[in-house]
């Protein structure tokens, strides 16, 4: 076992370190393999334009002031400057260390041993109120170390937001809670508007892409239960493309999702976060994303956000309103 590195020393990707809470974690989630896969050249349509506006600075200030983790930062989202410049952010609950190690994800992994910030629900609600958000997305790391997977913490946060900002729509992009319907029900009873859980990839690639504790059918079952338990709550999921799936498998996955009553689908290009993560198998063209969106709409999804830089929570407020995203994503 390598020597642990204490913050604030810069930690290289794949190294172990200790967080400020004393949790041992692996930076960016995947141990360093010492190998570097040859990368495909990035196509011109994936050029990211950085935005710097006063709104960007305001969001960053609020996030830092209230010690909030955002998936925008932790998952190295390519849209961070655009979304923050529009005054919106996806807030990540329950810390920045995940108990799982999916091979596409750059969130740090480890075992928090039950640690939770008891002030986080109220801090999050205060931040949402100060930012005067019409729509907020909450997500989190997986917390298999907690008996309920963090469902009650999620629910407390949503109730706190709704109490301070009753008009704010709340979307929760959650872990799978190991398939526990009881834990999912706790969250669904909190007053949220959209329940999201990501299937991430096609069934054939689930094992090599996701942590072994995740499952394609398990995710489908949780989404189906959410819709059955609370028909008034929209259900949503996301697929990354470019991991080695075929177009036929994508369409088959759409059929599986509709059979489990999923309302909203997002499709985006997988981007390799570090050399230790899964390599990109292909870059999907904007034209293909557009075609897949139309196929999804014909299959009955309320909305399909589909484009190279689309992520689970990208333009979530517009998706919620079914605001015909078109081809500009």
UniProtKB/Swiss-Prot annotation:
Pfam families: Radical_SAM. It catalyses: [[Fe-S] cluster scaffold protein carrying a second [4Fe-4S](2+) cluster] + N(6)-octanoyl-L-lysyl-[protein] + 2 oxidized [2Fe-2S]-[ferredoxin] + 2 S-adenosyl-L-methionine + 4 H(+) = [[Fe-S] cluster scaffold protein] + N(6)-[(R)-dihydrolipoyl]-L-lysyl-[protein] + 4 Fe(3+) + 2 hydrogen sulfide + 2 5'-deoxyadenosine + 2 L-methionine + 2 reduced [2Fe-2S]-[ferredoxin]. [4Fe-4S] cluster 1 binds at residues 72, 77, 83, 313. [4Fe-4S] cluster 2 binds at residues 98, 102, 105. Its EC number is 2.8.1.8. Its cofactor is [4Fe-4S] cluster. This is Lipoyl synthase. The lineage of its organism: Bacteria, Pseudomonadati, Pseudomonadota, Gammaproteobacteria, Legionellales.
């Amino acid at each position: 076992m390598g020597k642990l590195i204490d913050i604030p020393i810069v930690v290289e990707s794949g190294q172990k370190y200790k967080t400020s809470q004393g949790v041992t974690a692996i930076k960016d989630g995947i141990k360093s393999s010492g190998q570097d896969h040859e990368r495909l050249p990035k196509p011109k349509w994936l050029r990211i334009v950085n935005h710097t506006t006063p709104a960007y600075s305001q969001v960053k200030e609020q996030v830092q002031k209230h010690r909030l983790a955002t998936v925008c930062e932790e998952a190295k989202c390519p849209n961070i400057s655009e979304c923050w410049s529009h005054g919106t952010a996806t807030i990540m609950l329950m810390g920045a260390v995940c108990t799982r190690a999916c091979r596409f994800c750059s969130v740090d992994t480890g075992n928090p041993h039950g640690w939770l910030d008891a002030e986080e629900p109220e801090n999050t609600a205060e931040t949402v109120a100060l930012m005067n958000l019409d729509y907020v997305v909450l997500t989190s790391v997986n917390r298999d170390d907690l008996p309920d997977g963090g469902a009650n913490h999620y629910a407390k946060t949503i109730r706190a937001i709704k109490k301070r900002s009753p008009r704010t729509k709340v979307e929760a992009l959650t872990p799978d809670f190991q398939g526990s319907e009881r834990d999912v029900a706790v969250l669904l009873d909190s007053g949220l508007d959209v329940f999201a859980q990501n299937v991430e990839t096609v069934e054939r690639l689930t094992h090599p892409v996701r942590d072994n504790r995740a499952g394609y059918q398990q995710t489908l079952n949780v989404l189906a239960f959410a819709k059955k338990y609370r028909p008034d709550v929209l259900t949503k999921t996301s697929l990354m493309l470019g991991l080695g799936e075929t177009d036929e498998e994508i369409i088959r996955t759409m059929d599986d999702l509709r059979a489990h009553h999923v309302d909203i689908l997002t499709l985006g290009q997988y981007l390799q976060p570090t050399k230790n993560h899964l390599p990109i198998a292909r870059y999907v063209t904007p034209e293909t994303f557009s075609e897949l969106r139309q196929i999804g709409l014909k299959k009955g999804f309320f909305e399909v956000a589909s484009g190279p830089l689309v992520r689970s929570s990208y333009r979530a407020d517009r998706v919620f309103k079914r605001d015909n995203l078109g081809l500009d994503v």
